[in-house]
Amino acid sequence: MKARELQELRKSSPQELQSKLNDLKAELFNLRFQLATGQLENPMRIREVKKSIAQIKTILREEEIRAYQQ
């Protein structure tokens, strides 16, 4: 994800982030299935999706911590 996209994600609501996270997890599942069957055209996409999942989880956790501290 680009820095601009990350800033937009930080402005999103937790529900939107959770929805995006679920979509990315489903995409990762499909990519792994394609990899196993030898149909995956772009193996780097797996890495990109994993990184996006980690970034969204980090943003969600930061918001949890921020809410707890207040």
Swiss-Prot record:
GO terms for cellular component: cytosolic large ribosomal subunit. InterPro entries: Ribosomal_protein_uL29 (IPR050063), Ribosomal_uL29 (IPR001854), Ribosomal_uL29_CS (IPR018254), Ribosomal_uL29_sf (IPR036049). Disulfide bonds: none annotated. GO terms for biological process: translation. The keyword Ribosomal protein applies. GO terms for molecular function: structural constituent of ribosome. It comes from the Bacteria. Keywords: Ribonucleoprotein, Ribosomal protein. PROSITE patterns: RIBOSOMAL_L29. It holds the Pfam family Ribosomal_L29. Belongs to the universal ribosomal protein uL29 family. This is Large ribosomal subunit protein uL29. It comes from Clostridium botulinum (strain Hall / ATCC 3502 / NCTC 13319 / Type A). The lineage of its organism: Bacteria, Bacillati, Bacillota, Clostridia, Eubacteriales. The gene is rpmC.
